[in-house]
Amino acid sequence: MSNISKETVEKVANLAKLEVSETEATAFAGQLGKIIELVEQLNTLDTNNVEPTSHAIDVSNVLREDVATKGLDRKEVLKNAPDQQDGMFKVPTIMEQ
């Protein structure tokens, strides 16, 4: 049986930059524990005679052929830019050198 503690949930939430309340952390700990128990049940299955596969169903490419097309010209692209300089988008600096 897998035991996920409230502290583990809080640590993972912190690493993922998520805010969770005490109540949510307690609830998530129980829910995650149940999920892990269900996944652990898969380890009991005998898969010796099961052929490895990457997809459960046959997959075929349904995408169109990649064809290069003429793009927008620079003036058309920049006409709605809030700020531009030398024919390029000008954006605020976010990193110092």
From Swiss-Prot:
It catalyses: L-glutamyl-tRNA(Gln) + L-glutamine + ATP + H2O = L-glutaminyl-tRNA(Gln) + L-glutamate + ADP + phosphate + H(+); L-aspartyl-tRNA(Asn) + L-glutamine + ATP + H2O = L-asparaginyl-tRNA(Asn) + L-glutamate + ADP + phosphate + 2 H(+). One of its GO terms (biological process) is glutaminyl-tRNAGln biosynthesis via transamidation. Its EC number is 6.3.5.-. Keywords: ATP-binding, Ligase, Nucleotide-binding, Protein biosynthesis. InterPro entries: Asp/Glu-ADT_sf_sub_c, GatC. It holds the Pfam family GatC. One of its GO terms (molecular function) is glutaminyl-tRNA synthase (glutamine-hydrolyzing) activity. Signal peptide: none annotated. It comes from the Bacteria. Allows the formation of correctly charged Asn-tRNA(Asn) or Gln-tRNA(Gln) through the transamidation of misacylated Asp-tRNA(Asn) or Glu-tRNA(Gln) in organisms which lack either or both of asparaginyl-tRNA or glutaminyl-tRNA synthetases. The reaction takes place in the presence of glutamine and ATP through an activated phospho-Asp-tRNA(Asn) or phospho-Glu-tRNA(Gln). Heterotrimer of A, B and C subunits. Belongs to the GatC family. This is Aspartyl/glutamyl-tRNA(Asn/Gln) amidotransferase subunit C. It comes from Listeria innocua serovar 6a (strain ATCC BAA-680 / CLIP 11262).
